[in-house]
Amino acid sequence: MTAAPTAGGVVTSGVGVAGVGVGLLGMFGPVRVVHVGWLLPLSGVHIELDRLGGFFMALTGAVAAPVGCYLIGYVRREHLGRVPMAVVPLFVAAMLLVPAAGSVTTFLLAWELMAIASLILVLSEHARPQVRSAGLWYAVMTQLGFIAILVGLVVLAAAGGSDRFAGLGAVCDGVRAAVFMLTLVGFGSKAGLVPLHAWLPRAHPEAPSPVSALMSAAMVNLGIYGIVRFDLQLLGPGPRWWGLALLAVGGTSALYGVLQASVAADLKRLLAYSTTENMGLITLALGAATLFADTGAYGPASIAAAAAMLHMIAHAAFKSLAFMAAGSVLAATGLRDLDLLGGLARRMPATTVFFGVAALGACGLPLGAGFVSEWLLVQSLIHAAPGHDPIVALTTPLAVGVVALATGLSVAAMTKAFGIGFLARPRSTQAEAAREAPASMRAGMAIAAGACLVLAVAPLLVAPMVRRAAATLPAAQAVKFTGLGAVVRLPAMSGSIAPGVIAAAVLAAALAVAVLARWRFRRRPAPARLPLWACGAADLTVRMQYTATSFAEPLQRVFGDVLRPDTDIEVTHTAESRYMAERITYRTAVADAIEQRLYTPVVGAVAAMAELLRRAHTGSVHRYLAYGALGVLIVLVVAR
């Protein structure tokens, strides 16, 4: 093993571990303030680490540590260049700096460093046209989001009379509303919320898999951090319509993301849309906390805030594991198309187990990392007594339905990804020749899988982090949250659940079934090995198996009005008769409907304007001087 990949991975893990340590100090210690005046003109760099910043710093570092270990073996297989290897730890450091920033200037600097570093990593394989297209989409979307954040925070700093977060004064309701909308657009773009998600299913599949894990499990969380820090903490507690806006954006993102994931055939694209779904659930929980607090239901508001924080931890664990497992499959086969995979359970058993753990966590079912957080969210919604408030009475049942439908569709999407991609027989020679990932890649996945199991059966271990992070929200400060332990109890709601007991019961039942099956097997005669019945055909072929496309076809048909699939059927008739078919070719593709209806017309209009500007480039110096003179006249008239 060469020194370069080892050094890059070790440095990335080291930066991640350091981030975890510093983040925990910020969460459980006093607020730490560091000011370095000479690093930036006029304002300097101002670091102020509190509980909320410490939570996100520790979470980011916890993702980076196993990804760095995974990176060592991944680089050996994929041969990343020196520039990406050097930028990965810088990307992690920039992400750690974002929640530590204590001033608007420092925050904007860290945010832009994070964006530039991630763009360089997305373009690691820039020789391919798909990568260049994804990089362009990501660059445009992230810079448009940055402009919205820049304008919003500059307006906030000017109205609040300070560049530092701690020194911001009260601002009028009009400024609060404007800053809320601008920052929701900017941070929502980074979090992949609908309709600002268009970059995510393009950039994540084309980026190297360790980078995809960092972006999807850590970077998108910082979009949520921006919403929490500025909209819900510094500007909060917000009015009722803020909560309704977050509920609407979160619910739409959750449903649209999981619908696209359920019909996606590209494994990494499926996981990218799953990120949009989970960011939507977190945003929905934050909106519920804001709405409930405005109506005086502080108990459900506190539980909803805790659900959002816990789900961020769970998503970071299972999504980093899922992208690392998908990267192992890609490195072993060169494929992301589920229709060409299969049979990996025998060839890559460890990777199969790891992806299964991640898929279970993404489903939100018992024994999965996301179960407890989604259970908390549902409990907060169904126990929010509406009283005489018609808004709460209308929105909470709808929100419960959104969470339930998103969970069901997520089960379908992850069942498809695991069953089609890893079980059955190989559908291509590449899948048949697959081999298990190297030890360092398996070690990184094992760490993330261990975190998923801990969150599934013992959320007690992260309870202090969740309590302290949730308590930073004004909506959750009126009630002390103490219900997250070995048994998750909600005293104000007469609800409880014991994930550890559920795990023990399932394990005991599985052992009992295994013992009974072994006992019955011993009493039976030895089974005979006979050819598998092929329904009258000569032999079974891989074409007779379900594919990802056929698995998703019922959902595609039910939600056709939303997904807008493009379907084409071509029938080739025999020479003897046009009533007899020799071949029937069925093609279907599901593009992003929002991208086609919203972004494609905008891109077309921009291209048309660019063509008009190109025609103005005639090469005539006299015409260029006339343009300049006209511009000067316009400036003089406007500035008069």
Swiss-Prot record:
GO terms for molecular function: NADH dehydrogenase (ubiquinone) activity. Belongs to the complex I subunit 4 family. The keyword Metal-binding does not apply. PANTHER family: FORMATE HYDROGENLYASE SUBUNIT 3-RELATED, HYDROGENASE-4 COMPONENT F. Its main location: membrane. The lineage of its organism: Bacteria, Bacillati, Actinomycetota, Actinomycetes, Mycobacteriales. Keywords: Cell membrane, Membrane, Oxidoreductase, Transmembrane, Transmembrane helix. One of its GO terms (biological process) is ATP synthesis coupled electron transport. The chain crosses the membrane at residues 8-28, 52-72, 90-110, 136-156, 179-199, 208-228, 241-261, 277-297, 298-318, 352-372, 391-411, 446-466, 497-517, 619-639. This is Uncharacterized protein MT0090.
